[in-house]
UniProtKB/Swiss-Prot annotation:
This is Notch homolog 2 N-terminal-like protein A. It is linked to Defects in NOTCH2NLA may be a cause of chromosome 1q21.1 deletion/duplication syndrome. Deletions of NOTCH2NL (NOTCH2NLA, NOTCH2NLB and/or NOTCH2NLC) are present in patients affected by microcephaly, whereas macrocephaly is observed in patients with NOTCH2NL duplications. Belongs to the NOTCH family. The keyword Iron does not apply. Disulfide bonds join 14-23, 29-40, 34-51, 53-62, 70-82, 76-92, 94-103, 109-120, 114-129, 131-140, 147-159, 153-168, 170-179, 186-197, 191-207. Cleaved by ELANE.
Length: 236
């Protein structure tokens, strides 16, 4: 509503819930969010508000008591920042180089002592490494030689130790991760690009290839049907 003075000037008298020279802002204090007796102070030009807290309270909405541990005991050590989660609980954000619930420990993992993809955790200023399968040692620096334990490779296969793992080299006629399967040349087919596999012996095969157009440089040429003589191969 516009109110006019005798001299011709006037102002806008805003209805409840609106503020500003032209009542263009909603009153941010309409729903008073300030707790514990706090007073809402509107910033009309910005449509925002702040809480002026009663004695003994703090926080954006005056929701925390100044007797909160973050204020009284200051539990976060070594420059850590205390975050109030509720009236009496908190969480510390630690400075780089420190860890622990209250940032009380030096972060022993900062130097990345754990090797080979292992996980580092700090406990009481010391690090502990959780190793991936295939590695051992305080820092997971030692490769486990799986081939020291017999029986990994079946049917006379030879065990080859690899970093963090091992591989079985199979005798003729066997295949699979543990040399536990009979080798059938065309099952599954090794031929690619639509080629057809034909078994030519106990351990040999050939691929009958489809006619294929191949680009070499700027020229196109047609490759006729050809036969590739395959030999036994190790799938591993």
């Amino acid at each position: 509503m516009c109110v006019t003075y005798h001299n011709g000037t006037g102002y806008c008298k805003c209805p409840e819930g609106f503020l500003g020279e032209y009542c263009q802002h909603r009153d941010p204090c309409e729903k008073n969010r300030c707790q514990n007796g706090g007073t809402c102070v509107a910033q009309a030009m910005l449509g925002k508000a702040t809480c002026r807290c009663a004695s003994g309270f703090t926080g954006e909405d005056c929701q925390y008591s100044t007797s909160h541990p973050c204020f009284v005991s200051r539990p976060c050590l070594n420059g850590g920042t205390c975050h109030m989660l509720s009236r009496d609980t908190y969480e510390c954000t630690c400075q780089v180089g420190f860890t622990g619930k209250e940032c009380q420990w030096t972060d022993a993992c900062l130097s990345h002592p754990c090797a080979n993809g292992s996980t580092c955790t700090t406990v009481a200023n010391q690090f502990s490494c959780k190793c991936l399968t295939g590695f051992t040692g305080q820092k997971c620096e030692t490769d486990v030689n799986e081939c020291d334990i017999p029986g990994h490779c079946q049917h006379g296969g030879t065990c080859l130790n690899l970093p963090g793992s091992y591989q079985c080299q199979c005798l003729q006629g066997f295949t699979g991760q543990y040399c536990d399967s009979l080798y059938v040349p065309c099952a599954p087919s090794p031929c690619v690009n639509g080629g057809t596999c034909r078994q030519t012996g106990d351990f040999t095969f050939e691929c009958n290839c489809l006619p294929e157009t191949v680009r070499r440089g700027t020229e196109l040429w047609e490759r006729d049907r050809e036969v590739w003589n395959g030999k036994e191969h190790d799938e591993n």
